[in-house]
């Protein structure tokens, strides 16, 4: 077979057995994920897509979900913990929830796509039967004791709260039990009549309003390790065998012995169980592994960062750590498992299939010119392909529609990809999170993303975290920080900035902010996560009380603040409601001129600036 063997991207070839790999020539733009989505719809097993890093995982999931909408399979991931190896704090509850859900459903999966990074694949996992053996099931009509379910929930790793807001929480109010199960999209409200379940309803955690009723719910464990009697005994026995320290002076050992779920226990997973599993133990035998790029190199770089951090932190006698092989899996061992599965390699191989895709020409608008979209207009006039414009959000779609309208282009709105394929409109527009489009010459189809029309401005917007703070306390530049300044981390509370430290992870030297908390505990925050840090706004900077890492102190403080904010928000809503009843002067905004004006701004706007501009233009265009 030659390099130029061409195949239909809507029906790409799949490997027949584990002995003969299938090669796809590296496609352009979003074509890889389109091909995987199409292949997953008729494959006789799930597809495991292995990406080189977490950013690739996120983009792949978004594109796969778009192309797979209305198809008979699901797209999900086993997300990375998003912590450094041997970190002293735990992953976010939403990450743990997503991981537990993936591991629970994976063994019985007959069709779908699981996306994972090579670094996440190199972590040991709890035993295969752990999640199912520690799950609970609640059904309407089932007999239930409140005291018993409370005890079971706490043992499973759920936290008692007053109002359920995030995964792994539950609240008891009389005969009503609110639970936010791990792996669930929404929390549930369990209503008891005497000692039996009378109703089970989903509810909105923000409004606390009940939604649709269900007949049963599944409660997965709240963490990836057990803190029952057996789990604690295993931990204590292994700790005594591995470490020659004074256990009375080891807070980690004391916490686990008392059944306290202390942060960072994920990196001690190996001593809670007699045996661990890898992801391959969870995969069905019919799984097809798909990967691109040099995974071995990426895995070696990650292992180097693991061993480097291990050497740095192994000297801490008050928090001894496990050796790398107990926590992580070497890349050679990972890749040796590939031979047990069918495999798709995306590379320019002599026997690679060509998916027949082409890169789009440069369509970037030149807003400084009188006719900024000349390249796009030429493409439309010279070609007869059907074009699908892709905007990120409904608001961006309306803006793009106005822009295209000014140059005589009037696309038809389509709800999704399958709908576009079924229609024959020459120009269409949809909401799709595509980084890059593609050209399918054999199908006479072009996908044009916002990014390809506006350049990096859209990509930069996408990469900003949704949780970015909009207060004037946000730190936008490291020069604003001085050593020993009091700072606030959104998840861990008040600490002191102790400077920058360079740590090598995944083969890259990355700078971290060092924040010191009570009892000299240190937290390392990547510079890329600077938006999580803000200045302490209190008056007494010298005597500010520092929070303790790994306690609920900061969580309680945030909850009290949230309650006060809720009261203030109610007052503001009343004010805004009164303002809405009054009409003002409506301005008509020339979108083309406004975009031209905006593109002349020589700097990248801050989140505050963008938000202010958006509010102003929206208000001006409304009555």
For the regions a protein language model found, what residue spans apply to each?
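A short, hydrophobic C-terminal helix/tail in secreted or cell-surface proteins
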Residues: 619-623
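Major-groove DNA-contacting interfaces characterized by cationic-aromatic clusters
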Residues: 543-550, 554
